[in-house]
Amino acid sequence: TRLREEGKEVSGQVNHLITINLFTTITNANFDDAIFYDRVKATLDMKADLLAKLDNKENLSEAALWTASTKEEMEAKAPLVGVLATENEDIRSLRELIIYGIKGMSAYMKHANALGYDDEAINAFMQATLAKTLDNTLSADDLVALTLETGKVGVDGMALLDSANTGTYGHPEITKVNIGVRNNPGILVSG
């Protein structure tokens, strides 16, 4: 976010790393702790590279400056920054609603990226909004407005994925299929 404020380009590699990180954490998508440690390590390495490119390092958040080199350091930090670290239940709920919206958006983006489609505005929004979920000066009203904006940009993400799918595979069309039975062995596909 700060790099963009300085007019510097954020690479597709950074955007895709963040998208994959978010996608990795969606519900029921990953149960392997080692993958999460690897993702955090890769992100911290990338963050160090990004910090080196910044001209103005003043007033960066603690999250922007934090680093770790061991699994134990990561585990020690987790309860201090996890969901329950936000005491106000209304603020916590709104932040999580926004984060889940961004995770959903990351799923659209990941699948669109796999087909060669991307959108810098959506990437920038996701990253700036993640940073805003750490901003303790935002009120519940501010977070409600951000939730609504997240929904709007989520629709943009769906549109990008639709363009990626139809641009790659064509538009769905009604197709007649034989639903009869034959004497040959076969595989039943349903769903």
Please state what every model-predicted region is:
Residues 1-191:
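Metallocofactor- and cofactor-centric catalytic cores in central/energy metabolism, strongly enriched
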